């Protein structure tokens, strides 16, 4: 029964209906579509695999460390990795995205009184709360195993990107589901790799994505906030 509760909690946390505004962000994808880099199902899959790789090298290992820090109620470690992640956001849109979503999820954690008082206090004490920090706190509070938490965040990111592709390329619904299904083994492999990276191996190096984000800030016509 405990396992079922953890699964239900994971499905809830990774749900696109979670009111944190994920659907309003494309993480540079809208700019890539505008420039013709993503134009069909094949190029969309190439983009998604590349994005999952970027997540694997930095965001996911940070999440893993935050999960451990929250489980040990280690406020210093939570603050260190939180500040590290916020500092890694190269553009104003990327920083605003993660802080807005993190704030919204943190508010849910606090208002719903998830976890214990000490855990929520650590969350509230952060100057800026990016999404990985809020996600880690929520996952730990809900009793979701760390490995499943990594998979949940990756799948949630991939699903959001696929939905943006379906709306903006545009692609058909069948293409979108085919894309998402094809990413299952990629997500699993990325989760395993992320869990094995040492601190010295973490890297947020993605200059092309940063340039797309900067260009999106001045893009004439857009429907997404990043």
Swiss-Prot record:
Q: Which residues cross the membrane?
A: none
Annotated localization: Cytoplasm
**Which terms are listed as keywords in the entry?**
Chaperone, Cytoplasm, Nickel insertion
Major site of localization recorded for this protein: cytoplasm
One GO cellular-component annotation of the UniProt record comes to:
cytoplasm
One Gene Ontology molecular-function label = nickel cation binding
> Assembly state and interactors?
UreD, UreF and UreG form a complex that acts as a GTP-hydrolysis-dependent molecular chaperone, activating the urease apoprotein by helping to assemble the nickel containing metallocenter of UreC. The UreE protein probably delivers the nickel.
PANTHER family referenced in this protein's UniProt entry, alphabetically: UREASE ACCESSORY PROTEIN F
Family that this chain belongs to:
Belongs to the UreF family.
Quote the protein name from its UniProt record. Answer: Urease accessory protein UreF
- Native source organism of the sequence: Nitrosospira multiformis (strain ATCC 25196 / NCIMB 11849 / C 71)
